[in-house]
Amino acid sequence: MLIDSLSIKVWMLRKVESAGLHIQSMKHVRPVDARRHLSNPLELNYLYPGRELLLEAPMEWGFGLFNLSGHRRFLNDVMQEAFDNPGRERDLLRDALRVFYADWQPANAAEFLGVSFGQASELVDAPPWQAYSPWDAHNAVEKSVKRQRTELRENTRILGKRLDISAGWKFCGPVSEDKLEVEVERLARVLESIRRQGICRHDGTDGDIRACVLTHSDGRWRWMVHGGQHRYAVISALGAPRAIIRVERFIRREDVALWPTVTLGLFSQEIALKIFDNYFAD
């Protein structure tokens, strides 16, 4: 008896589903290409509910690794010099990062977020790497475990030996010499890739800089990097005026009363808005 291809496909789908898995066409999961959209991107959230969005965002409105408030553009000069001098990039980046990690050593998660000790008491006793934004879904234990696993995986992949978060966190100092080398190497590899083939993207899971968009009631918006931190750091430091980002979610200022950490009483609305508004400061 001949078995047609459709029957085989149905049989395979049933097997996959019986294992608790689901197969979906790429056209349903690839981001909506909205790079030509010029007005407030929040509009797209209503046009394409539940979909990830591809935007071309002004670089000056973005925040991420080595480019948070108070440290913006410190890599710009050295990154261009590193780009123009193949073979010297690691030495140049190492010197710059050593200064950054020595200068920026917040005592705890509260200081990392820029709030006083009395404004977020839970964060005073937490190390900087346990900081979270007021709009994050609050599960401190899960977030801590995930961040530790991510750092361990990234460090081990680059260094070739086990190195956990006790050696330091990429966003601030202090860091060990091994952790410094991990960050130097990650930036250098991105820089070399851009030098070789330009800035590339694809529709896969790791194909873009992933971000959330913060929207103000007056129409202004900013974006925060969630994934692709080193790509963002290099591209922004090289002076690109805009970046292609994949937007995963929108955070509306007027929804502050609904933000998870606010409803749980971990942040007051006043402090939550202070953290939010810091991203809109000139």
Locations of the language-model features?
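Membrane-proximal basic amphipathic "stem/tether" segments
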Residues: M1-D77, N85
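Short, solvent-exposed loop/turn segments at secondary-structure junctions
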Residues: E60-W61, H216, H230-R231, F250-R252
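Short alpha-helix boundary/capping and kink motifs at helix termini
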Residues: M79, F83-L93, E154-M224
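A structural boundary/capping signal
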Residues: D84, R90-L97, E111-F117, S121-L123, ...
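Extended, charge-rich helix/loop segments that form flexible
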Residues: Y101-F171, S176
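A sequence-level detector for short glycine-anchored, His/Arg-bearing signature motifs
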Residues: H216-L238
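Glycine-rich phosphate/pyrophosphate-binding loops
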Residues: A240-R249
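Amphipathic, charge-rich alpha-helical segments that serve as recognition/docking helices
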Residues: R252-D282
